[in-house]
A protein has these predicted regions:
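Hydrophobic transmembrane alpha-helices and their membrane-interface caps
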Residues: 2-5, 325-394, 433, 451, ...
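Flexible hinge/switch segments at interdomain interfaces of large molecular machines
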Residues: 8-19, 56-62, 97-122, 151-157, ...
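Structured binding elements
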Residues: 21, 141, 445, 972, ...
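Helix-loop junctions and hydrophobic alpha-helical segments within the transmembrane domains
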Residues: 302, 309, 313, 317, ...
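Extracytoplasmic/periplasmic membrane-proximal domains and adjacent transmembrane bundles
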Residues: 11, 22, 65, 91, ...
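Signature of alpha-helical transmembrane segments and their immediate interfacial
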Residues: 1-8, 413, 482-535, 942
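Extracytoplasmic/periplasmic
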Residues: 1-93, 97-100, 127-156, 184, ...
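Transmembrane alpha-helices and their membrane-interface boundaries in multi-pass membrane transporters
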Residues: 378-392, 413-433, 440-483, 597, ...
Length: 1019
């Protein structure tokens, strides 16, 4: 029941909550928005509880977007409330037009969940499609629990557009203030009250509600607004001085789907929500809404993060089944009896299903980490049952009955079973208390296995003995066929092993030397093996960023993007494409010279290349094929919500407020130095301080001499060139805004100012051109702040076969060498989390080893036995490093990342578990049976060889499918499989010699023979 009710997601809830604050300052440039809006808002938010960092972006379209990233584990709802409370204290400092627009605060994620393309068969325009989505789809999707926001990329939302003709304003001697006043008065909505309302006169019989004429809502009605009346009685209406149309609130974005107009619906989930549940709800709602679509309108899924999640979970389930089959095969090979095989086989469903049953209580979900834990648990949970069955069978072959054999066996194996279980718990439970993303990933993995191991141990001490007494029978004295040949072969190997062990354990210096060489080899390989955080995974889509030369028009960008789009669609591994021109997704701003293409790839089974390989190939192809634009493809980061791209994200900050020019110069110098480093593949930034602009120089003395109020002049320029918001109107059941701006032909270039006039307050129109001069200049398209410092964001991609960890170290070294004290650097997005987690792996390993040592010391009341057990751990670590290092020479994806670290923690427990089987039994034979130390050691090694080989190879075969996994999240499985197989192979093949040798070494150094004599005298 729990399995079917558990939520399915890519990762546990490890994404830091993000609260977004956004607003618009109509007509303002980036610097103005930054100074007037972003700075006061950022100052009010700074220091809010649980904040990690915040980044504000102010753009030339007047928009301000600020994202506050909070600590993992904080409550997103409370984060949003605290942020809103702080923002409210800054509202009084903001310009009036900003507060009129409203300042929105909402919790969201930076990574999108699903992207839909709404298209038609040619009957509808992009304007219609976008507004159909605004009116009929957006709010319905926002109602879904877990949906954070729904952005629509395409033609803007409807707005009443008043396109003024400045020369006609001058002709009719009408000021802008008169136009504003008329539209506000005649286009607004006003209450009227009641006739006979209370307190009423004594003779009032009825009360009537009074209504005014309904608010106007269409272009014709707005055009009929009376602006003024001439002395001759002629009325000047709005349509006489302006073109009025139902247009868009914002222009500048054009979207196409396979060359047809489209509206892109970008759906983001809320922090803490379940991706698959939210995605399924969104899909069901879209299917319901599509039944009401007008004829000719359809929708296509371009990006669906849930598809890769579900496919990845399905693949891991398949891996789990394959592992189960292989484990059963190896058990049957060694036990050679279906009855004996059945006993450990029953331990698997009991332990695995039992663990799933506890998932709801633990707050766990079915995700990549927990499922990988279950795959590895298959090889673990059979170990205890195998040890029991093997011991019982040995006793039965001595002539004991099944019941007596079971009782006798449990006397000898109960202690090792408890010990190995305690060791595994000592490894897994402490590391689950780590913080950060790393700690949360370790938590899901380690607790999943710990629960399975506990159930397995309980099963081995209760159910397995009962089944042994009921099911096991003496095996035939004479065996034939395959099993007979296998037993003869294994018997010879056991004799050879016993002989080799007898010769080996006597050389104490050799044993110590092997341990020392192993530790030295680990240090060398660890130093040279690249490190990283999380591998990039194939999510079924790529994105292509396209950028034309600075200041290019939207039409120029659309043409370039159509060329890129056409080339991308020709690839056989591409299913569909859809793009939005006029939007810079990397910077998060509207930009006429930028655009993004969503590329949906064909199913994983129908293509030979991963999304990363396709992105690399596209980047190379487009660089040559489309020289008129800069185009490069990229994939999303492995953890949704931590940035847009998968590269390294770095913020370069102006710590002393020296200005944009200073910061830009230092950043360019820094980037040039980075490009010379062998660890760096590419360095890019969306920031550019050299964008062609025009500056209007105002001769204030001349303007004032002509009686021009400067406030009126600035308002005139802001309104005519940038547009101004007036009021709202209702239509289609929604509230829309009214904007006033000069018609396009009156803001074509600097010569358009010749038709602009300002009223001097005495009825005279003063031409703007009489006291202004337009000069060419350069400036920025957007301004960024990071933690209140002016900043420039860099995206760095490591060179081939260089990990992100190596690249980040190189970046820090260059920054320390090149940048002055006035300029600082800091990480953001996934890079911030990686840097926070870096260095924690050593603490994890140390914590695991210390807890194992202390646990064993308490269990055995000895310092020597735990030391003998733990000195075998380096072999497993060396095996993992050798295998992963060899794989790295073939593929750069095999590095020391978090999956490698998880594997090493597991190997600490596994190698200690195998060592316990030999060391504890040798200790029993020596102290309880009074055998000679060397003889006890050799006998323990001989008797424990078969169960060690059986449990080790059942685990190795159980994780072997991970090495050969392909498809979704294959990289994570490949790395874990390689590390675990390598570690267990070396720990098994060499460990069976090292385990007894280490016990003998510790016993000799610790003078165990003297201790036994003292115990015997005391007794």
């Amino acid at each position: 029941i729990s399995i079917f009710d558990l939520p399915i997601e890519q990762y546990p809830d490890i994404t830091p909550p993000v609260v977004e604050v956004s607003t618009t300052y109509p007509g303002a440039d980036a610097e103005t928005v930054n100074n007037a809006v972003a700075t006061p808002v950022s100052q009010s938010i700074m220091g809010v509880s649980d904040m990690l960092y915040m980044q504000a972006t102010s753009a030339n379209d007047g928009s301000m977007n600020l994202q506050v990233t909070f600590d993992i584990g904080s409550d997103p709802n409370m984060d949003a409330i605290f942020t809103q409370n702080n923002v409210s204290t800054a509202l009084s400092q903001l310009p009036a037009s900003v507060t009129q627009q409203g300042v929105t605060t909402r919790k969201t994620m930076t990574g999108f969940l699903i992207v839909y393309s709404l298209t038609s068969d040619g009957r509808y325009t992009g304007d219609f499609l976008s507004n159909y989505a605004y009116i009929n789809i957006q709010n319905e999707l926002l109602k879904i629990d877990g949906v954070g926001k729904v952005d629509i990329m395409g033609a803007g939302e409807y707005a009443m557009r008043i396109w003024l003709k400045p020369d006609l304003l001058d002709y009719y001697k009408i000021s802008l203030d008169e136009v504003f006043a008329a539209v506000e008065a005649q286009g607004g909505i006003f209450p009227a009250g009641k006739f006979g309302g209370e307190p009423a006169a004594g003779d009032v019989t009825y009360t009537y509600t009074v209504t005014m004429p309904p608010q106007i809502y269409d272009a014709e009605q707005f055009g009929d607004i009376i602006i003024s009346t001439t002395p001759e009685g002629e009325q000047v209406r709005l349509s006489d001085i302006a073109d009025v149309a139902l247009g868009s609130r914002q222009y500048g974005v054009e979207s196409l789907f396979n060359s047809d107009p489209t509206a892109l619906l970008v759906i983001y989930q809320q922090p803490g929500s379940n991706a698959v549940d939210v995605g399924n709800s969104v899909k069901a709602e879209m299917e319901r809404l599509s039944k009401r679509f007008p004829d000719g309108i359809t929708y296509t899924s371009m990006v669906d993060a849930t598809t890769s999640i579900e496919a990845g979970v399905k693949d891991i389930f398949v891996t789990l089944i394959i592992a189960l089959i292989l484990v059963i095969a190896i058990i049957f090979l060694f036990l050679q009896d279906w009855r004996a095989t059945l006993i450990p086989l029953l331990a698997i469903p009991v332990s695995i299903i039992g663990a799933f049953a506890l998932f709801p209580l633990l707050g766990f979900s079915i995700n990549i980490i927990s499922l990988l834990g279950m795959v590895l648990a298959i090889g673990l949970v059979v170990d205890d049952a195998i040890v029991v069955v093997e011991a019982v069978q040995v006793n039965i072959e001595k002539g004991l009955s099944a019941k007596q054999a079971t009782v006798e066996a449990m006397h000898s194996v109960s202690s090792p079973i408890v010990a190995t279980t305690v060791v595994l718990l000592a490894v897994f439970i402490p590391v689950s208390f780590m913080g950060s993303i790393t700690g949360l990933l370790f938590q899901q993995f380690s607790i999943s296995i710990a629960v399975s191991v506990c159930i397995s141990s309980f099963n081995a001490l209760t159910l397995s003995p009962a089944l042994c007494a009921l099911l096991l029978k003496p095996r035939p004295k004479v065996q034939k066929g395959f099993f007979a040949a296998f037993n003869r072969w294994f018997g010879k190997r056991t004799e050879e092993y016993t002989s080799a062990t007898t010769r080996f354990i006597g050389h104490l210096k050799r044993t110590g030397g092997i341990v020392a060489v192993t530790l030295a080899a680990i240090a060398v390989i660890w130093h040279f093996l690249p490190s990283g955080f999380l591998p990039d995974e194939d999510q079924g889509y790529v994105m292509v960023f396209v950028q034309t030369p600075e200041a290019s028009s939207l039409q120029t960008t659309v043409k370039a993007m159509q060329r890129v789009d056409e080339l991308v669609r020709q690839r056989p591994d591409v299913e569909a494409t859809s793009f939005a021109a006029g939007f810079n997704m990397l910077a998060g701003i509207a930009s006429s010279n930028s655009g993004i293409i969503f590329v949906k790839l064909v199913d994983y089974s129908q293509r030979s290349k991963t999304s990363s390989q396709i992105a690399s190939a596209l980047t190379e192809e487009l660089y040559v094929a489309v020289p008129e634009a800069v185009s490069y493809a990229f994939i999303s980061p492995s953890i949704p919500g931590l940035g847009v791209t998968s590269g390294i994200t770095l913020q370069v900050q102006d710590l002393e407020g020296r200005g944009t020019e200073f910061l830009a110069d230092e950043t360019m110098r820094f980037m040039d130095s980075l490009r010379k480093q062998p660890q760096i593949g590419s360095v890019t930034t969306q920031f550019n301080a050299g964008i062609p602009q025009r500056r209007i120089e105002v001769d204030k003395e001349k303007a004032l001499a002509q009686g021009v109020p400067l406030r009126s002049f600035y308002k005139t320029m802001s309104t005519l060139l940038g547009g101004s918001y007036i009021n709202n109107f209702n239509r289609f059941g929604k509230l829309y805004q009214t904007y006033i701006q000069a018609a396009p032909e009156y803001r074509r270039d600097k010569y358009s100012l010749e038709s602009y006039f300002v009223d001097d307050g005495q009825g005279n129109s003063i031409p703007v051109s009489s006291f202004t001069t337009v000069r060419d200049t350069t400036g920025v398209e957007f301004v960024s702040q990071f933690n209140l410092y002016r900043s420039i964001e860099l995206t760095v991609n490591p060179a081939a076969k260089v990990s992100t960890g190596q690249a980040m170290d190189a970046i820090e070294a260059v920054a320390a060498d090149v940048l002055p004290e006035a300029v600082g650097t800091t990480w953001s997005g996934l890079s911030y989390q990686e840097k926070t987690a870096s260095g924690s792996s050593g603490a994890v390993y140390l914590l695991a080893i210390v807890f194992v040592f202390l646990t064993l010391s308490a269990l055995y009341n000895s310092w020597g036995l735990p030391l003998a057990i733990l000195l075998s751990v380096p072999l497993a670590v060396l095996g993992a490093l050798l295998f992963v290092g060899a794989a790295y020479l073939v593929s750069p994806e095999f590095i020391n990342n978090i999956y490698m670290q998880i594997s090493l923690v597991m190997l600490i427990g596994l190698s200690a578990k195998n060592a316990i089987l030999v060391v504890e039994y040798a200790d029993q034979l020596f102290f309880e049976k009074n055998m000679d130390l060397k003889a006890a050691t050799i006998e323990a090694a001989r008797l424990r060889m078969r169960p060690i080989m059986m449990t080790a190879f059942s685990f190795i075969l159980g994780v072997m499918p991970l090495i050969f996994a392909s498809g979704v999240y294959a990289t994570a499985r490949n790395i874990m499989g390689m590390a675990l197989v390598g570690g267990m192979l070396l720990a098994t093949m060499l460990g069976i010699f090292i385990y007894p040798a280490l016990y003998y070494l510790v016993a000799r150094v610790g003078k165990f023979e003297r201790k036994r004599e003292l115990k015997q005298k005391e007794s």
